[in-house]
Each structure stands twice: as C-alpha cells, then as structure tokens.
Amino acid sequence: MEKIQSHARLVVVGGGILGVSLLYHLTKEGWKDLVLIEKGELTSGSTWHAAGQCPHMTGSYNLAKVHLHSTNLYKSLEKETGQATGFHDCGSLRLAYKQEDIEWFHYVKGILDNVGAPAEIISAEEIKKIHPFIRLDGIVGAFYTPEDGHTDPTSTTNAMAKGARNGGAKIYRKNRVTDIKLLPSGEWKVFTENGDIVCEHVVNAAGSFCPEVGQMVGLKNIPSINMIHHYLVTDEHSEIKKLTKELPVTRDPEASAYLRQEGKGLLIGPYEMDA
C-alpha cells in the first residue's frame, strides 16, 4: 500500500464524481499540490450505480450554466484525456399535463436561451416523432432539450481523474481517513490508515459519509441526508432493437419517474413518496 505524502495545499476526502470533479477543475484553475483520498476505489460509494442523467432543464440560472458546462465537458473529455466518458447526447423530454406546465416551460426556456442551451416547447403530436412509445393520453406538450442526455458515471469520473492526474494531482485509493485535526498553525492534519498529511484546505466530498467526516472537525449537523431510490433495467426489447436513433431521456412528473433507453432495453426510475 502506497504511503501518503506528508504535505499538500488541498486534500479532497472522497473519490466519487463530485470529489474527482473538484480535483479536476482545480487543476484547470492552476492549483498545484492537490491530493484526493478515497477509502475504496473511485466511484465505489454512490457514484457507480447512479443513473447518470445530465439534464439542461432547470429553473435556476446558475444551475443552467453548470449543467451546460457539464455536458460540454463530458463531450470533450475523451479528446483531452483519451478516456471515454460514456456520454449519450440523446436529448431529454419533460412531459406536461397542464397548461400551467407549459407556462413554466416558457420561463425555463428563457433561462436556457440566455445561457446558450438549445431548448424547445413541443406539442403532443411532436412528441411522437421523438419518442414513438409514449402514450399521449392527457399530455398537452413537452419541454425538449436536444443536446443533453445521460452519461456513464464511472467512466466520466475516471476520465476526470485522468485529467486531474495529468494536471499534477495525486489520488490515493484504498486509504481511509480516520480523523482530521486543526493545528496551531491554522493548517489541517488529515490522519489516514496509510500515514498522515498536513494541508491548507480540506474538502469534504465523502457523499453518504459526509456527516461522519464533518464530525471529525466538530460539525455535527451537515445538511446531507441519504435518499432511498431505485431504478430497474428491463431485458432487451424487439421494438427498441429496431430503432436507428437512441430515445431521449423522458421525465414524467405525474408518475414521478424518469425513463430512458439502456442498451436495447429500458431503464425506469420511480421516486418514492417517503424516500
């Protein structure tokens, strides 16, 4: 097991897509002497089994910019790093059952137009041209974002990890953080199973384990909770095998679920009411 280096400018705790993305982006901002510590393998917490949706649709201007940056990055990372991300630019649909939904779509479209993310408000008849398997009963239209889609979370994380390493960052896997202490100098000492490291900054990107890491520095109420969520993947389907173009990710607010193509089958994710 590789012993950890003794000093760094910044230490990220957690090797999911959030921690690795931060590491990658800090190298792009010119930061040096960066370290990430992961207790298992990269993505081995919650990231690896995420459904990987990458929507452009949001009612927040700031999030719209983040979403657009993310999809543009996932499309370009393979050229930069040689590591495929598994991004599918199949587009997305959000179904509307009420005229109020359409009115909200116009508000959202104004935001996406402002940040440069293509978006359309389409009729029920136009939905059939994009997704032939949707029943149109009660549907009055949809919000269509043609350039987003979904990505492979593990492949995307590994591509950013390679980019971060290329930028000089160091990643230590299979090394659990056991404690974090503030030193009189104002620096932090991060204790791990394979040695200790002193740094200027610590980032808690531990996902489900964020509260535990927070308690190491006296933060008892980090606003992070786990949510129960399932998705199911069907067998291959003969009608999907006939398709020449991948189906868009579809979100149905009435069913509180999303649906997308997975290989030659479907992936369906319902949101539980009491999650």
Residue ranges and their predicted role:
Residues 143-201, 209:
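Helical element adjacent to the flavin cofactor pocket in flavoenzyme catalytic cores
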Residues 18, 42, 209:
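Conserved Rossmann-like nucleotide-cofactor binding loop
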Residues 52-130, 254-259, 263-267:
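Dinucleotide-binding Rossmann-like beta1-alpha1 core, especially the glycine-rich loop
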Residues 27-48:
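Glycine-rich FAD pyrophosphate-binding loop
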Residues 23, 27-28, 163-165:
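Gly/Ala-rich phosphate-binding loop of Rossmann-like dinucleotide-binding domains
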Residues 4-18, 35:
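Beta1/beta-strand and adjacent pyrophosphate-binding region of the FAD-binding site
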Residues 21, 180-275:
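Flavin-dependent oxidoreductases
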Residues 15, 58, 206-207:
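Glycine-rich, N-terminal phosphate-binding loop of Rossmann-like dinucleotide-binding domains
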